[in-house]
């Protein structure tokens, strides 16, 4: 099975390739993306992914004539820092990577974000390839060119837009993905259903396998990957630099990022935080008269069915969430912009959220 989805940007167009066995054929895919044999490639990965898939990828790329080296970085959101990216720069310097060289991100969203940021800034910009191995990275983080690292006071505050040459998705890598990480990716899939693709939402809602990722039928997994990637590609093609429409992809992320930051990126993972953020956004939309209660309840039920949290972590200070929102990247003129549903498949962007309403919603989803 192979599906190719174009990301139709005026100057930086590329393809998302969804291909079973894609890792073994990586050399061919990179050549089709205009990376030539003889190019120096630095694969950036983490220990677990490197052990499982590193040798296979290196062999495939070397067979295609690429000059390949690897760098293993620690796993986890708390390591997505400038200090960790410095290690990529150091390795690039050691290997004497040139402007015609390329970085290859093999892993989840953290690896992809850091590798992309290093590629955006090394020699003022070199090529990079995304080979995501988590569901979350496949359907979201690897697509669209957002790269960056965290600041101690906020998530992704340091970054750049830098589009990959190729996104290569091999669904077979999901077979070894821990269940919790698979569920985290489902949060982003549910997001696409709410903001863009009502039919996708209803298929998720009807599936008896949503809480059993290991039992997910292959045809449903293929649909999830293809429809999610198409949704992201369509939005990015319309608004590459997030000047308007693309902000809808941050649905659930406004409060979600605050939750991640306040818990030190240790208690909840990104997908879990987004799930909590979607619950909050849905309830805000109902409170403001933008969304009906029935669809809000349906969203919350699907999130819970997928094994994702619908309440804030215990002990989190709601006032601290409100304060952390002021560091959100979408703040304009001191006002936090929220992405709120109006009907399944459609959302609106507003900065007209009374602080009292926000506090009431946060109180309602607090753990007792």
Swiss-Prot record:
A single GO CC term, please? Answer: cytoplasm
Keyword Cytoplasm found? yes
Report the GO molecular function annotations. 3-dehydroquinate synthase activity; metal ion binding; nucleotide binding
Per the UniProt entry, the disulfide pairs are none
Q: Pathway involvement?
A: Metabolic intermediate biosynthesis; chorismate biosynthesis; chorismate from D-erythrose 4-phosphate and phosphoenolpyruvate: step 2/7
State the needed cofactors, names only: Co(2+); Zn(2+); NAD(+)
Keyword match Lyase: yes
SUPFAM superfamilies, per the entry: Dehydroquinate synthase-like
Q: Give a Pfam family name.
A: DHQ_synthase
Q: Which reaction does it catalyse?
A: 7-phospho-2-dehydro-3-deoxy-D-arabino-heptonate = 3-dehydroquinate + phosphate
Superkingdom, taxonomy of origin = Bacteria
What is this enzyme's class at the first EC digit? lyase
GO terms (BP aspect)? amino acid biosynthetic process; aromatic amino acid family biosynthetic process; chorismate biosynthetic process
Query: Which controlled-vocabulary keywords does the entry list?
Result: Amino-acid biosynthesis, Aromatic amino acid biosynthesis, Cobalt, Cytoplasm, Lyase, Metal-binding, NAD, Nucleotide-binding, Zinc
> Can you quote the record's cofactor note?
Binds 1 divalent metal cation per subunit. Can use either Co(2+) or Zn(2+).
Where along this sequence does the record place binding of Zn(2+)?
Answer: 188, 253, 270
InterPro entries reported for this sequence:
Dehydroquinate_synthase, DHQ_synth_AroB, DHQ_synth_fam, DHQS/DOIS_N, DHQS_C
- Residues that bind NAD(+): 109-113, 133-134, 146, 155, 173-176
In terms of one coarse class, where is the protein primarily found? cytoplasm
List localization entries.
Cytoplasm
Q: What is its EC number?
A: 4.2.3.4
Q: What does this protein do?
A: Catalyzes the conversion of 3-deoxy-D-arabino-heptulosonate 7-phosphate (DAHP) to dehydroquinate (DHQ).
The entry's family comment says:
Belongs to the sugar phosphate cyclases superfamily. Dehydroquinate synthase family.
What's the protein name?
3-dehydroquinate synthase
**Which lineage do the record's taxonomy fields give for this organism?**
Bacteria, Bacillati, Cyanobacteriota, Cyanophyceae, Synechococcales
